[in-house]
Regions:
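Active-site-adjacent helix-turn-beta-strand microarchitecture at beta-sheet edges
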Residues: 1
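Catalytic centers of hydrolytic enzymes
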Residues: 5-9, 13-280
Length: 280
């Protein structure tokens, strides 16, 4: 129960953080008014949770003070980039398939929900993935469409490095709004005037925007964050149909490799048996 409670706390905390990214970018002085489709937060960059009670700016800073930006000041800046719909689905798959043994890849999103089955084949665990607007309405993801994504510098680099770590199996390439690959993510930091918009500042400003419901002069975390809103749902079904339906390209490739390996082994066994029989 303690582990479940802690996991739920983390989900709610990271939902607040990912929503803060969206709020900050859409409300910063340098915003061009373009809607943010998805915000991505990795659990690995968050150093502390937010417990019930007063949350100070110092606590927010301490929870997200890792790294620096181009300006050399403490804290990773927010990054504005674009991913294709296909890459967004891959982001969900990275979390579902890799995060259990590579915790920095555990991701939380605002604007994108997904369902995954931990018993399915690796890189084919996600069974449903879709966007959700501010009204909560479901929007299907179009594979070739560019979507506006906001994350922090650390996450942007981590997602970009997935290609190397997966030996080319997985590809997530942050792009500009015209679809050109971004070479230096630091050049795409979200600016607030002449300053980089730091992730911790975005979180603090978002919390300060909450309504003061008890009229004590301090903003209150909304009731909305008392639940996870099924942003990430685990379907633990072991039904054989649910385990094999809708195979993606990774599943097909893995099955193909297994068939080839088994075929080679059978040929070797057949060859060895043939040689032994000849010697007799």
């Amino acid at each position: 129960h303690t582990a479940y409670r802690r996991q739920r706390q983390m989900c709610i905390r990271d939902s607040i953080i990912s929503d803060a990214y969206v709020y900050a970018v859409e409300n910063t002085g340098d915003s061009d008014g373009e809607k943010v489709d998805v915000a991505i937060v990795p659990a690995g960059t968050v150093r502390d949770t937010y417990t019930k009670g007063d949350i100070t700016v110092e606590q927010v800073y301490n929870s997200f003070s890792l790294g620096t930006g181009k300006d050399g000041l403490a804290g990773y800046p927010l990054i504005s980039a674009y991913l294709t719909g296909k890459e967004l689905k891959t982001v969900a798959e990275v979390d579902a398939s890799i995060s259990d043994f590579m915790t920095i890849a555990r991701l939380y999103c605002s604007g994108m929900n997904f369902i995954y089955n931990p018993h399915r084949m690796i890189l084919n665990k996600v069974t449903d993935c879709y966007l959700t607007g501010k009204d909560g309405e479901r929007e299907e993801i179009q594979d070739d469409k560019l979507y506006h994504v906001v994350t922090d510098l650390y996450t942007g680099r981590m997602l970009g490095s997935v290609l190397d770590k997966s030996y080319g199996l997985i590809s997530i390439v942050p792009k500009d709004k015209n679809g050109n690959p971004i070479e230096n993510l630091e050049d795409y930091a979200v600016m607030d005037g002449k300053k980089e918009l730091k992730a911790w500042v975005a979180i603090a400003e978002y919390m300060q925007s909450f309504e003061d419901t008890d009229k004590d002069g301090i903003a209150n975390v909304p009731e909305y964050y008392n639940t996870t809103h099924e942003r990430k749902v685990i379907d633990s079904s072991k039904n054989i149909i649910n385990l094999v339906k809708h195979p993606n390209k990774f599943a097909v490739a893995i099955v193909g490799i297994c068939i080839v390996v088994v075929g080679v082994i059978l040929l070797l066994i057949f060859g060895i048996v043939k040689i032994i029989r000849r010697r007799r």
